[in-house]
Amino acid sequence: MSFDAEKQLAIAAVRRASYLTEKVFNQLIKEKSAAGALTKDDKSPVTIGDFGAQAIVISMLKDAFPNDPIVGEEDSDFLRENTQTCSRVWELVQETIQHATEYKELGQIKSAEEMMSIIDQGSYHGGRNGRMWTLDPIDGTKGFLRGAQYAICLALIENGKPVVSAIGCPNLPYDFNQPETSPKGIIMSAVRNHGCFQYSLHNEKLEPVQVHMQDVQNTKDSKFCEGVEAGHSMQGTQEEIAKYLGITRGPTKMDSQAKYASLARGDGDIYLRLPTKMTFEEKIWDHAGGSLLVEEAGGVVSDMFGKPLDFGVGRTLKNNNGVIAAYKGIFEKVIEATAAVTSKDPHFQKVAQ
């Protein structure tokens, strides 16, 4: 089955939402920081960006595919209780819609009340049968606040498997080999069995380029990446795994599913995310889109035990523990190394039981 209509709509929705998040950063973070008015604990720009991006994407999805349920991250309760924040979100949503150039007839939200109702349509419980979309409106909130990597992540799941993905990375250089001179902003998109492609975020006329992971066969030549936040994964154990594999260079640390996009185009070869708590369940919107990018670019994605990620059991990956992504040529070696290192650690033995 062709998913071209879904792919094109997903790219357009992610692009529109990315523009809104860039407005939020420039108006509410960059300017405030320059004026010394943004405190370290001020998370309001992320809140505004999250709600605005979710409203933009869901409104377009519901206009194009009204019967598809959506698993989103936010609901409107906070906005209904905070009218000032709601007004700011509504102002940015209106501004973004007015400047839209693609699918202009879609996502025409008429009021703040309609906007909040649309946000609430992301409350689907998930499941294994039929179609559903997953959305993370701003993945990597701390990266967003720092002006580093974050992502707008959208995926279509059919019968428990991701089949369409579009991930917007506004701060990822188009050419990772020339980060200082290459324009920032990409959208990475994939359709199952049809490859992974990189699009320019800001130049809609630029032809997409199919991307592939590096054909690395020796793990000592590979590059591995992990999240920035030490509390999100067992970084010490991950470093031990890298040493076991013969990797001598340090990890690339990056927030959000921009890591998956980077792997897909060959900027890295291995992504390790081992759980810090045995009971932690990864959210499906944090991995659905990114995992498909890597798989369509020549990689394999599983949990730390080599089990495929199961997106059909609700809003979380409750049947999995952690995440490992790697180029197919070295994937089994990475799983073997992970088993060798973690088998000695009671922390992970509890997970395996």
Curated annotation (Swiss-Prot):
Disruption phenotype: Deletion of this gene leads to sulfite auxotrophy. Its EC number is 3.1.3.7, 3.1.3.57. The keyword DNA-binding does not apply. It holds the Pfam family Inositol_P. GO terms for biological process: phosphatidylinositol phosphate biosynthetic process; rapid tRNA decay; sulfate assimilation. Adenosine 3',5'-bisphosphate binds at T141, H232, S256, K259, R273, D286. GO terms for molecular function: 3'(2'),5'-bisphosphate nucleotidase activity; inositol-1,3,4-trisphosphate 1-phosphatase activity; inositol-1,4-bisphosphate 1-phosphatase activity; metal ion binding; nucleotide binding. InterPro entries: DPNP, Inositol_monoP_metal-BS, Inositol_monoP_superfamily, Inositol_monophosphatase-like, Inositol_monophosphatase_CS. Inhibited by Li(+) and Na(+). Mg(2+) 1 binds at E73, D136, I138. The keyword Nucleotide-binding applies. Gene3D superfamilies: 3.40.190.80, Fructose-1,6-Bisphosphatase, subunit A, domain 1. Mg(2+) 2 binds at D136, D139, D286. Its cofactor is Mg(2+). Keywords: Hydrolase, Magnesium, Metal-binding, Nucleotide-binding. AMP binds at H232, S256, K259, R273, D286. It catalyses: 3'-phosphoadenylyl sulfate + H2O = adenosine 5'-phosphosulfate + phosphate; adenosine 3',5'-bisphosphate + H2O = AMP + phosphate; adenosine 2',5'-bisphosphate + H2O = AMP + phosphate; 1D-myo-inositol 1,4-bisphosphate + H2O = 1D-myo-inositol 4-phosphate + phosphate. Mg(2+) 3 binds at E73. Binds 3 Mg(2+) ions per subunit. The active site is at D50 (proton acceptor), T141 (proton acceptor). Belongs to the inositol monophosphatase superfamily. Phosphatase that converts adenosine 3'-phosphate 5'-phosphosulfate (PAPS) to adenosine 5'-phosphosulfate (APS) and 3'(2')-phosphoadenosine 5'-phosphate (PAP) to AMP. May regulate the flux of sulfur in the sulfur-activation pathway by converting PAPS to APS. Is also able to hydrolyze inositol 1,4-bisphosphate (Ins(1,4)P2) and inositol 1,3,4-trisphosphate (Ins(1,3,4)P3), but is not active on inositol 1,4,5-trisphosphate, inositol 1-phosphate, fructose 1,6-bisphosphate, AMP and ATP. Confers resistance to lithium. This is 3'(2'),5'-bisphosphate nucleotidase. It comes from Schizosaccharomyces pombe (strain 972 / ATCC 24843) (Fission yeast). The gene is tol1.
